């Protein structure tokens, strides 16, 4: 190492000497040659002197700069002090006039005092830190002190000047003290004013007592409000219970309704079936009648013409009848389907019932006969009655028959019009939906419109208010200007025409006066006011005008009192009128009640009369109406009682409230009169105080600083108020949102009501339409027969479609079950993949930890080398720029390489994306098909249940909406309750703050005593300040204005408090409105329930009608049966004799029955009309009752307006109380602040004195810091200059010498070492981060513990506070008791009570202060912890982003195998570069070792080492090849032929489903980064290791060759050795670069060749495979099948690859090129030959592979054969899927290439023949069997789903091939191309 260091030192000395000479020459202005002529010692001395001179220069600069800065700072301080003095004098006058307001703000003084003390401590700490830094700088500056001795004298002069300035400052301070002594003299005059103040405090105590009384009343009102709330809560609970009960009833009714509906449906079905039977019978009857009439006519003719042939005709007639009966029976048998058997049974049952009825009729007739026989002896009257009854019976029978016929016709017409009615229903439903949508839109738009109108109105109102405010402000401004004008006049007269204002200000006021246009618009009264009150000559005149003002105000107050009395009287009148109106309303309601009862009795009587005439069917309806009336009656009675009770309560409350309010108003008027008297007194005293105020203007010097502090406090209070306002605004916004939601709900309810009304209306319309459709039934009878035939055909078609649909459904269910099984299997597979991923992640984590350990060990080695780096840093600075240029060049080259690779990656990514989109589109198509089929099925099923479901859904929606509304109401109530609680808490907080303020005032009062001692000193200083009194008058005016402004601010605070209270009252009103809305909703619910009950009754009526129809039909059937029997009997008689009159009798009876039925129908219609009229009358009466109820509700709302007025009055009273409290507090604080003012001023002076030396030290330290910064700047400038100089030298010489190059290399090495140091620092930073994280966690734990302890403390303090509050409340209760006995007891007891109260308040204040301190500390700790947490979270998020980027890069790497191959190439190239860099370092070390051992002969044999490495490498490669072969043998197992044939039998639907499932699996596996990632990473690591070994071998070879040429002697110099090393490294770099470029070119050429060969082969194969399609479809000799539902895994591989008996076979070595082609086709997602569906990405289960490996040996015609020639030329690279014909063409086209390849690689064939013998034989067998068994294309497309799994495994085995072999392949390909 010593030999190596000597040349480096010599080089450095040479460089330093050149630099020295240049510097000396430039300094003295000589040439370099002259300087070089000097001796070395002289040059050294000159250089030392030059350096000293430069140092002196820099120090001189520093000193001058520091001196200038000191000067500037001292001047600034002097100016600042002067300005401060002037400001103090000015603000002295302001503070005197603002005294009343400043006392309120004295509380902030203490806080700021604490702040100042904390700042002082902070400054002291800073001073300590700065002193430490100063010590450090002094240790560094001890060398420069010798040179700075001369300059110290100048600094001392500066210090003298500084001291002089300090002495002047002290003099100024002494003058201030004199002024303060004078001020004390003036304070004595204040004592007189204090006596008056004490008198006023006594008056204030009386006001406080009044305030306490008012507070007591407030509490009582609050208690009443709480009791009212409790009552309302109870009422709400009762209502909820009733709601639950009603819900249960509703559910019960719904269940009953459902049961009735089911029964109704069953009955309607049975009715329809019976009607069909009746139709068939009637048709047969009609046909028989027609035949009978024809036969009778024929018989009559035959009797007249051929009496002799009667017997023959009779025989013929009998035969014809038999034929007719047979025909009828045949027709009936044809009609009787399996479905009509049930109908026949029911007919038989009805016949049996008819028979029973006939028996009963016979029995009754027998009874009547007996009665007739018994009653023969009766008189003629009884017989006449009996005859009359018989006639009525006959009439009734006829009417019955007529009705039955009409009902039959009506039913038939209804059956025909069922589809039309259904279509009408559908249309009505559609129209209803459209109407609903339109109504919703209209409501939405109307709501929006209303909202916007409201907003517009509000904004207009605001604009009007703003305009009014502007007008008032302009008036006030004008009045002020006039007053100022007159004041100026008076001042100018008194001060010899020299006023206090400047000319500009006077002009400004005059401009305002000129611009005034209000005189035109002003009224006469306003002009008079301005003349009398604004314009004045003297102060005496102003006082007189003020007295006039007082008189006017008092007169106005009297008028107000009189008006208020009148308003009270009017209110009493209104109350009495309301009570009378309520009584009258009650009386009217009672009378109406009586009327209703009488009407109900009349209706009951009418109902009893109707019962006799009307059948039993109408009884149920009358009962229902009676029940409804009774219920309404009860409701009305209950409502009347409620109204009576409420009215009585309201009257009581109103009278009580009025009495209380009158008392309060009288008390207020009394207090107001007292206050007005006191105001007059105070104004007179104020005039005297103002005269004295001029003398006390100098006292404002002390109060200036206090004023600033108080202003800060005031700003802080304003901020808190603003925050409270923001909170209130938030609550208001929430309330508004709730209100909007409520309005939306109400609109929805209204919509529902309207929908219900529409539905009822539509039902009525439908009924009317049904009545209108009845006349059309005759026209539609003809179509019945045709429709019946069509119906039968349709039923047959429906049955067929149902059967087909059921078959399809069964098939789909089977397919679904299969899909579910497959999904379960694939879920299991996904879980396995997740477990594998977790294991991989753990492995990576372990690996990262190991790498970290290695990294730490490397860092330790780097630390040892850092000492050498520090020596060479000086050289690095000069050569940094050149290194950066080299880096830029390298970066450009790297960017070029990356862009080439990025383009290829992007293209392949785009292809994969296109394939995925195609796959997704196909999936969507299949899903759409499936959805359409399922929708069609659902539609057929849903149409049957729609009507029933709609009805139930509507009921459910209404109930859900009802529940949601109730929930919303409850939520709103809770929110209101929370808001009230928050307001109470805020009030409590304000009271606490008030107590704190009082406490601070007491402290200030104590401090004020100390200030009085200082007053005596100010008296001596008054003589000097008398000259400044004229100036101070101006300041007094400004201070007065400020005082007025602050008064206005306090008024704003009181306004905000009043606004809060107003909001409270508004909230109460809103609660009431919510209660009203709740009542409305309840009423709406009741109305809905009534409507539902009416609907239910209508349904029951319909049921009764249907039952009556059934009974009529049964009776009609009986009649028909009787007629049939009569007809059969008549036929028998006709056979014997021709009895024509019998038929005529039947017709007559039928006509009579028809007439009877007609009369009955008319009677029934009349009865119905009568009933309808009665119902309409009842509805009118109900509507009248409802209107009366609405009127009563309106009256109730009027009462609520009175309550609101009462609340407004209470709010005004509260505002007055607040004003009184504020006045009291302000006066108390005035007294306290006067005392504390002086103490604070003295403390401020002391603090200023303490701060002054600290500030001087700070400035000195700042100067030292600036000097250091200047030194740094100089150093940077020198570095920049040297860099420029080095650049100039380089530009001149243009070329670098070998020595410069060596220097650059050495500096590069140094930079590398610096990089390593930086990496080590990064590791240390990570460790620090981990430590910080642990510390943060520990702190979090400690903070949580502290938080828990703090919360406990807070709770304990709160408990103590509550105890104190309880004690306070007890004390207040005692005070109230004592106040009741105020007259009896004396003033002594009042004082004792006050003491108690003050003690309690003090205790509460102390607790609150403790609480605030604890909360502040708690909040500070929490904030600190939150900041630490946020920093930690940010760091964690950064790490997560890095991890996500890594994951994204890993996910992008998994897209395609082709991308992975290219990325591997990139990584290999990068590894080469890294390896070169690492090897250069190793070579440097080895060269050094070799140089040391050059004297001795080298014992190491490099060739032996090389052979060992090669043998190890070959062994590793052979092991990997064997492992890959074994894996292939396991996985390349094909199923048997019998099981492969099953795949063709499968449908395309199954394939499509499997495809979709596999696509989903692939997406999941891509997300979870499955097995491919692990395999590829292993392959990459293996490749990198092999490449490193190869590069090491090559590098060592070249080093040995170079070292062999070096002579074995020790006479070689160090320079020569360095040159040798540099030359070797440069050569190696050039060679490596050339190799990299050659590899890039070769890989590019290979890709081109592969693409060309692939396209040509694919075109040929497509043509031939299409020709083979027809043959393969016909000949199904060897159809492929799946093995146990596991598809063939090898169909994605090529079937054959250029077989030749001469060429050796190695499937693993040749498989890589095959993979490069196959990866593009398979990974792209589509089979280019057959299947329309895209192939899946490479993914499969390990279980399936193992099962395939254990199966029987595959058929040879499907086993893949590999044939890659030894040359690895074009054929091996372009090998793809091919058939036998393609193989023959390839072998014929490329014989020359194969021969050349066989010649070139003879040696490799000998070594690999043993391994490849078996695969070659297998390949020959494949050739023979593929000729006989050719595969169809469909088979390939179907089996392509699983072939990618095996290609993945083959890729794993084939990627073992090293980069060396690829390079050899490319060389041989180039040779063959050249041949």
Curated annotation (Swiss-Prot):
Annotated coiled-coil segments of the chain: 69-487, 531-1678, 1834-1866
Compositional bias annotation for Basic and acidic residues: 1738-1748, 1807-1840, 1865-1875
One MF term in the entry's GO annotations: ribonucleoprotein complex binding
Low complexity biased stretches: 1716-1725
Keywords associated with the record: Acetylation, Coiled coil, DNA damage, DNA repair, mRNA transport, Nuclear pore complex, Nucleus, Phosphoprotein, Protein transport, Translocation, Transport
Motif, Required for nuclear localization: chain positions: 1496-1565
PROSITE patterns, per the entry: LRR
Pfam (any one): Nucleoprot-TPR
Comp. bias (Polar residues): 1667-1688, 1728-1737, 1787-1801
Residue(s) carrying Phosphoserine: 379, 1670, 1710, 1733, 1803
GO BP terms in the entry: DNA repair; mRNA export from nucleus; negative regulation of protein import into nucleus during spindle assembly checkpoint; nuclear mRNA surveillance; nucleocytoplasmic transport; poly(A)+ mRNA export from nucleus; protein import into nucleus; protein localization to nuclear pore
Residues recorded as bearing N-acetylserine in the entry: 2
Location(s) in or outside the cell: Nucleus; Nucleus, Nuclear pore complex
Record bears the keyword DNA damage: yes
The protein's role, per its UniProt record: Together with the closely related MLP2, involved in the structural and functional organization of perinuclear chromatin. Together with MLP2, associates with the nuclear pore complex and form filamentous structures along the nuclear periphery. Has a role in the localization of Esc1 to nucleolar regions. Together with MLP2, mediates tethering of the some telomeres to the nuclear periphery, probably mediated by YKU70/YKU80 (HDF1/HDF2) heterodimer and show perinuclear location dependent silencing. MLP1 and MLP2 are involved in telomere length regulation but not silencing or telomere anchoring.
Something else known: Present with 2710 molecules/cell in log phase SD medium.
Subunit structure: Component of the nuclear pore complex (NPC). NPC constitutes the exclusive means of nucleocytoplasmic transport. NPCs allow the passive diffusion of ions and small molecules and the active, nuclear transport receptor-mediated bidirectional transport of macromolecules such as proteins, RNAs, ribonucleoparticles (RNPs), and ribosomal subunits across the nuclear envelope. Due to its 8-fold rotational symmetry, all subunits are present with 8 copies or multiples thereof. Interacts with NAB2, a hnRNP required for mRNA export. Interacts with MLP2.
Full protein name: Protein MLP1
Organism name: Saccharomyces cerevisiae (strain ATCC 204508 / S288c) (Baker's yeast)
Underlying gene: MLP1
